């Protein structure tokens, strides 16, 4: 397959230097495929841009932090009491909440821009070389649209198993317009996602182009990315054989990172990253960035004062020999002492643990970072202002996706093999001999641990139909009591049917102008959506 030479200039910093969309006509932007590639590259920039004039709203990173991690069971923001409602998932039924708005706004912005590219796609050209370029442009835009609808469905639609696809889906816009439009079903949403990805895969294969091989071009979509999106979409849809097929295809050209790469800060693409959000000091979003909220090394107060901490419940099942544990400040029982005296999320201001972390993690945290038990240093900023790339897909996720699908199909030996392949690079003595429910728990434990901080926790729990279980220090965990109340309405421990079945209502930014959509989902007695 040929490298995508026609976008070499567009892949440099100059691709950011575009006139505002409203000031450039479609005739200019889509004059030819080379020009259209700049518009495609702009989709990548949308994924790392500040939105709604709100600190912390940075595109893809916001979804990972605010939706995937803070409400989950893997990471808590040390003593960040002001974010209790976000951390406990108490905003799902608030159609005016900005955290509900931002994800809808961001992904539909991506969809609209992808649709603009697709609306201007040129076909039937006599110039074969130019047609192949246009086909590559279209394939990339289709991937962005399919990915956006996949991610939206995880938040704004119920679990696939709740109604086998007959629950409410999304507003499926496939062209640039402002027409009123009703919601689809979830099944119709995934029919579009599959159709877009099938066409993208076909075009990627036939056009003969690929993104440059440099790892710093992993922000560009290609055939592997299309397969990765397919894997995640099929996992949400419980389409197990499809998960297996596309997980294997997606990771074919990638290998698990080494222990040293794993500990290097997760801020730069490497051999394992399939797709990324690109950000560096030439185009930072400063205090709005993902790193300002999910690292312990940024100079912003959200990072220094309230660093992320991995839950003790996530660490405990992992073999102590696993080299990935080194990026977390895990205390010994002696360092913790009397748990009844632990403050909140585990803040420490002096003593043996404090001194050890300050010394051992000096290069991984900011000089004035507040120290907590189980402090996470997985993400390390490239510079103090908060810049750094973010993995969207890694080979490891594809292996966990496949393992989950294999388990659902009863292929337990395949699950054990996949687990060993993901763990042995970090613990050479690891073997998996478990079966049945114990194997399922082992798979979930290593998935949670490996993908920690990367935006999966809450989405995984929702898909599995698992309850939110947060144990306080007194209960053998490490959660602050204000994040772990036993209250299914507003607390931090609740079941899969609570809190609107973990489903966000459609925000008023849609319902205020689209009268065909309501932020109240009517459910029939059989669990399906009442479209009337």
Label for each model-derived stretch:
Residues 26-27, 54-72, 77, 158-166, ...:
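Short, surface-exposed recognition loops and adjoining beta-strand edges that mediate ligand/DNA contacts
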């Amino acid at each position: 397959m040929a490298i995508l030479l026609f976008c070499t200039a567009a892949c440099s910093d100059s691709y950011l230097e575009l006139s505002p969309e409203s000031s450039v006509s479609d005739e200019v932007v889509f004059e030819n495929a080379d020009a259209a590639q700049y518009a495609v590259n702009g989709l990548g920039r949308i994924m790392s841009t500040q939105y709604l004039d709100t600190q912390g709203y940075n595109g893809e990173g916001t979804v990972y932090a605010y939706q995937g991690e803070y409400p989950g069971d893997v990471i808590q923001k040390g003593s960040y009491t002001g974010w209790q409602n976000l951390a406990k998932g108490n905003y799902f039924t608030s159609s005016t909440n900005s955290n509900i708005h931002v994800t809808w706004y961001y992904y539909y912005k991506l969809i609209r821009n992808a649709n603009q590219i697709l609306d201007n796609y040129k076909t039937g050209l006599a110039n074969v070389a130019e047609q192949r370029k246009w086909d590559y442009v279209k394939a990339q835009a289709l991937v962005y649209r399919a990915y956006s609808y996949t991610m939206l469905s995880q938040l704004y639609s119920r679990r696939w198993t709740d109604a086998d696809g007959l629950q409410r889906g999304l507003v499926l816009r496939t062209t640039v317009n402002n027409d009123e439009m009703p919601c689809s079903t979830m099944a119709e949403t995934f029919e579009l996602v599959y159709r877009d990805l099938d066409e993208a895969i076909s075009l990627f294969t036939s056009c003969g182009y690929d993104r440059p091989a440099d790892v710093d071009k992993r922000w560009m979509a290609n055939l592997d990315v299309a397969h990765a999106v397919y894997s995640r979409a099929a996992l949400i849809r419980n389409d197990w054989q499809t998960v297996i097929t596309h997980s294997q295809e997606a990771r074919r050209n990638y290998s698990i990172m080494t222990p040293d790469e794993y500990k290097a800060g997760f801020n730069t693409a490497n051999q394992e990253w399939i797709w990324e959000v690109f950000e560096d000091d030439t185009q930072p979003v400063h205090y709005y960035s993902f790193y300002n909220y999910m690292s312990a090394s940024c100079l912003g107060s959200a990072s220094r004062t309230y660093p992320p901490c991995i839950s003790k419940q996530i660490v405990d099942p992992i073999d102590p020999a696993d080299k990935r544990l080194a990026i977390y400040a895990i205390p010994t029982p002696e360092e913790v002492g009397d748990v009844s005296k632990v403050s909140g999320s585990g803040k420490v201001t002096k003593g043996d643990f404090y001194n050890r972390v300050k010394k051992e993690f000096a290069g991984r945290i900011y000089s004035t970072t507040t120290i907590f038990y189980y402090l996470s240093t997985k993400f390390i900023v490239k510079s103090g202002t908060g810049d750094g790339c973010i993995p969207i897909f890694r080979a490891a996720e594809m292996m966990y996706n496949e393992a989950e699908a294999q388990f659902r199909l009863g292929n337990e030996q395949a699950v054990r093999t996949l687990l060993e392949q993901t763990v042995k690079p970090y613990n050479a003595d690891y073997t998996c001999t478990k079966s049945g429910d114990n194997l399922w728990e082992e798979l979930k434990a290593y998935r949670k641990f490996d993908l920690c901080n990367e935006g999966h926790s809450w989405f995984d729990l929702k898909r599995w139909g698992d309850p939110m279980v947060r144990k306080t220090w007194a209960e053998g965990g490490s959660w602050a009591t204000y994040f772990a109340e036993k209250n299914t309405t507003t607390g931090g421990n609740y079941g899969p049917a609570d809190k609107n079945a973990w489903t966000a209502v459609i925000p008023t930014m849609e319902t205020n102008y689209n009268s065909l959509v309501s932020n109240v989902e009517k459910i029939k007695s059989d669990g399906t959506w009442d479209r009337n």
